[in-house]
Design a protein with these regions (language model features):
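Membrane-interface interhelical connector segments
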Residues: 64-83
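Extended, low-polarity transmembrane helix blocks
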Residues: 2-65, 83-91, 95-182
Length: 182
């Protein structure tokens, strides 16, 4: 056996196994496994950023139009104490959005964020089915869409659960706090 037989890719022959040359795919798998191991601490960053941006954008949109506008929508859908619930929703979306973006207190802010998403699913989105896109018609070349289903809410829930299970990720306040405490 030569040194070339033990090295991956150095001779371009693939990885040598018991029964001869295994494919180049095995070597590629090892390269990707090493890359995955190096990047794993950063895996939560894209989730944090998209969830944080989503919550913050929704909260800012409701707040900029005025809580009374959102309260009117809630009241029309039969939500009790619509004005109070509008403020709770807006506050939760703003605080959770900033917290997710910063990676600060993620397990704590996940609780009200998940409750908010579940309430939205069961009070608003469930009757419209799974899909987030409901094409109603196309008039004069413009698409008309109906109310969204619960697809996006489930995606947010999955991302939040993944963030909580992953724990603090690199470049987050929670990670910084953990390093200070240890």
């Amino acid at each position: 056996m030569t040194a070339c037989d033990d090295a991956i890719f150095k001779c371009g022959t693939g990885v040598r196994g018991r029964e001869g040359t295994v494919s180049i795919l095995a070597g590629t798998a090892l390269v990707f496994e090493n890359l995955r191991a190096k990047l794993a601490p950063y895996a939560g960053i894209p989730l944090r950023l998209i969830v944080g941006y989503g919550f913050l954008a929704h909260g800012l949109a409701k707040w900029s139009r005025g809580p009374e506008v959102f309260a009117g929508i809630l009241q029309a859908t039969g939500v009790p104490m619509a004005y109070v619930m509008a403020w709770i929703t807006i506050g939760t979306e703003l605080v959770a959005g900033v917290a997710f973006l910063a990676g600060a207190f993620v397990p704590l802010v996940s609780i009200p964020a998940l409750i908010l998403l579940l309430v939205a699913i069961f009070t608003v989105h469930l009757p419209y089915g799974f899909s987030s896109i409901k094409l109603l018609s196309v008039n004069e070349g413009r698409a008309q869409f109906g109310p969204p289903g619960y697809e996006c809410d489930l995606l947010y829930i999955a991302c939040i659960v993944a963030l909580v299970l992953m724990g603090p990720t690199r470049w987050s306040v929670d990670s910084y706090r953990r390093r200070l405490m240890s």
